């Protein structure tokens, strides 16, 4: 843990600790924050859950990083850590970051370039036939509602994992992703996943590098 002042208690049998950070609790109890943290873990075990910031919290630095041509903005690592991370919506957060800078009249790149960095640039870098809208190509499209960027994209919630008997962390950004088409077939329609996705073939295919 880099800074216990950045770690906020989300769940705890002692409800008075929820919403507070470990550093404040330690000061209140006049103990070292590491001792406080370990004592709480021993006392509450897995019933103690907390949220912490591990990076990308300095927006000025983040804006510099996303402008660097050596930075490839692809996907997050959240899918490998379903119980303790949820930033599956990394591309949406990137677009909101760029839109916010433009709204403050401090633009760092156009939205068109930001979208290209998420699509065409990656197709070129990986050498796959993807990331562009051209006549005769597969129709792989995402339709976003710009008004949806007004919500907090860092919010996380719990959702049941079908057939696993446990919950995972998810991002829910209602109204932002309106439609998704994969190979010309609707995968998301009016913000809802279509029943055919994952149950019928034809939504995509292997894309070899060239």
Regions found by a protein language model. Give the residues of each.
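A general structural motif at alpha-helix termini
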Residues: 40-41, 118, 140
